[in-house]
């Protein structure tokens, strides 16, 4: 959640402005990205006044303002309360972009990913259907992991 401008709007608008878009295009892309993550009401809020969940959503809006084909995320659900975690999952599931997510939050992975690549000691152990991999008790134990909660 790296934010460095003074307001949410300015942070989300940073990339479009640096891409040389007109101010009208910048405003359109920025507001569109804020709406996708449901934080348009925070556009004028100072970055330092945001909660952890709001910072995550602002960071995702910043990414979306660039209209990427692929989004890379490292532990996106860490330090989120249950409500913001569920909100993040719902947002990720609505995004059309390909998502590459590194996470130890196996329940979030179950809820958001069709395909999983399981790594251990920097090596690919298994690549395939998320549910098949994460519900394989023997594989998970061999990899030093536990089954997702509730399974």
Which positions does each model-derived feature cover?
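Conserved ABC ATPase signature
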Residues: 46-50, 54
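Conserved beta-strand-loop-alpha-helix hinge in the C-terminal portion
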Residues: 123-146
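Hydrophobic anchor residue at the start of the ABC signature
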Residues: 59-60, 88
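Catalytic Walker B motif of ABC-type/P-loop ATPase nucleotide-binding domains
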Residues: 71-74
